[in-house]
Amino acid sequence: MYLSILAVGIGGALGSLFRWFLGLRLNALFPALPLGTLASNVIAGYIIGAAVAYFGRNPQIAPEWRLFIITGLMGGLSTFSTFSAEVVQHLQQGRLNWAAGEIAIHVTASVIATVLGITTVAVVTR
């Protein structure tokens, strides 16, 4: 149990730090659509897709690795709450089209990235 707690905790800390770094580097480039938040979610979507596919093909791998990568690292990297706050900010400012566009971009890009992650593992492990 302690190893699982460590896996999630360390993964979560590392993922959160990477998300923070992306925000620092990218959000100022285009404040109307914070690119750090978008990059965090898309990268996490890709890696989660690849990880789910990889762990599904390799059930012998210790479950702590799954907890570290999927629950911890990608849980810390992806940021639905920040995305939601950004959308609500657009809504409060009366920018309905921006809010709808941000929703469409985040959801579409993240789902496509997840499918690409799954596809990558399928192609590489043939």
UniProtKB/Swiss-Prot annotation:
Q: One GO biological process from the UniProt record?
A: cellular detoxification of fluoride
- Catalysed transformations (reactions): fluoride(in) = fluoride(out)
Among the GO molecular function terms of this UniProt record, one is:
fluoride channel activity
Short name of any one Pfam family annotated for the protein: CRCB
Q: Which Gene Ontology cellular component terms are annotated?
A: plasma membrane
Transmembrane stretches, start-end = 3-23, 35-55, 68-88, 103-123
Q: How does it sit in the membrane?
A: Multi-pass membrane protein
Chain residues that bind Na(+): G75, S78
Q: Which keywords are on file for this protein?
A: Cell inner membrane, Cell membrane, Ion channel, Ion transport, Membrane, Metal-binding, Sodium, Transmembrane, Transmembrane helix, Transport
What switches its activity on or off, per the activity regulation note? Na(+) is not transported, but it plays an essential structural role and its presence is essential for fluoride channel function.
Q: InterPro entries annotated for this entry?
A: FluC
Localization, per the record, is: Cell inner membrane
Q: Which family is it part of?
A: Belongs to the fluoride channel Fluc/FEX (TC 1.A.43) family.
Function per UniProt = Fluoride-specific ion channel. Important for reducing fluoride concentration in the cell, thus reducing its toxicity.
Give the protein's recorded name: Fluoride-specific ion channel FluC
Q: According to the entry, what is the taxonomic lineage of the organism?
A: Bacteria, Pseudomonadati, Pseudomonadota, Betaproteobacteria, Burkholderiales
> Which gene holds the coding sequence for this protein?
fluC
